[in-house]
């Protein structure tokens, strides 16, 4: 099973909402709101685990990511397979070097109301998600985000914060599966080169363009 093809397209899409403008909320969400409002760009490393309904790890992966608000993201898997997702705010490119294949999607359709929208989306996050304090566990304060749309492919996303720094994201899908991402070396408001969010298909790659044609 290819990592990106299943939970990652959805994760990347919940990941893009946590950096959208947020209406004022009170209580245990303060750290998340501070991170949300104060972070315009970031880079980090991540470790990803996918669990089945019985809690067994069925996939593990690692890599790096960068984002810039609004709507720009670069997500690269190093292990176990090299795969890349790049979004420039208009289009999302998914590159699988092993297959020499590039898929192009309209970013708005691919990312709205998904986990990636939690970090770099364009809209007020409260129009896409219902947010609530989810208490503390594993040394982190958790916030739960439930999508208001019905066709997102996941039930809820949990965001774990260490102070005002995002440390983890946990995606619960509608089939009882769970994907956990833990972040390291997170650098809020890092200088991210513009080319991080641009992509040109390699020569000879099979390009599948799913964007609307004018």
Language-model regions: role of each:
Residues 36, 111-126:
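Short, solvent-exposed helix-to-loop capping segments enriched in aromatics
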Residues 2-15:
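Bacterial N-terminal signal peptides that target proteins for export
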Residues 103, 126-130, 136-211:
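Gly/Pro-enriched, hydrophobic low-complexity segments
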Residues 54, 98-100, 175:
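Solvent-exposed strand-loop boundary residues in beta-sheet-rich modules
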Residues 27, 122-131:
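A short, amphipathic edge element
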Residues 62-113, 179:
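An acidic-aromatic
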Residues 19-58, 201-214:
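N-terminal leader/targeting segments and the immediate start of mature chains
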């Amino acid at each position: 099973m290819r990592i990106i093809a299943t939970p990652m397209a959805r994760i990347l899409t919940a990941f893009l909402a946590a950096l959208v403008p947020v209406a004022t909320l009170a209580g245990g969400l303060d750290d998340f709101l501070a991170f949300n409002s104060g972070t315009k760009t970031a880079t980090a490393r991540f470790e990803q685990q996918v669990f089945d309904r019985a809690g067994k790890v069925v996939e593990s992966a690692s890599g790096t990511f960068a984002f810039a608000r609004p709507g720009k993201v670069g997500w690269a898997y190093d292990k176990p397979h090299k795969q890349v997702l790049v979004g420039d705010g208009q289009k999302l490119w998914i590159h699988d070097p092993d297959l020499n294949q590039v898929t192009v999607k309209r970013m708005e359709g691919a990312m709205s109301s998904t986990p990636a929208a939690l970090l770099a989306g364009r809209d007020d996050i409260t129009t896409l998600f219902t947010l609530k304090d989810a208490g503390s566990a594993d040394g982190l304060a958790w916030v739960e985000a439930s999508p208001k749309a019905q066709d997102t492919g996941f039930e809820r996303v949990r965001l774990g914060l260490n102070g005002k720094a995002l440390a983890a994201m946990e995606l619960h899908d509608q089939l009882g599966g769970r994907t956990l991402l833990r972040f390291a070396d997170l650098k809020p408001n890092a200088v991210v080169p513009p080319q991080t969010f641009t992509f040109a298909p390699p020569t000879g790659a099979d390009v599948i363009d799913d964007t609307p044609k004018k």
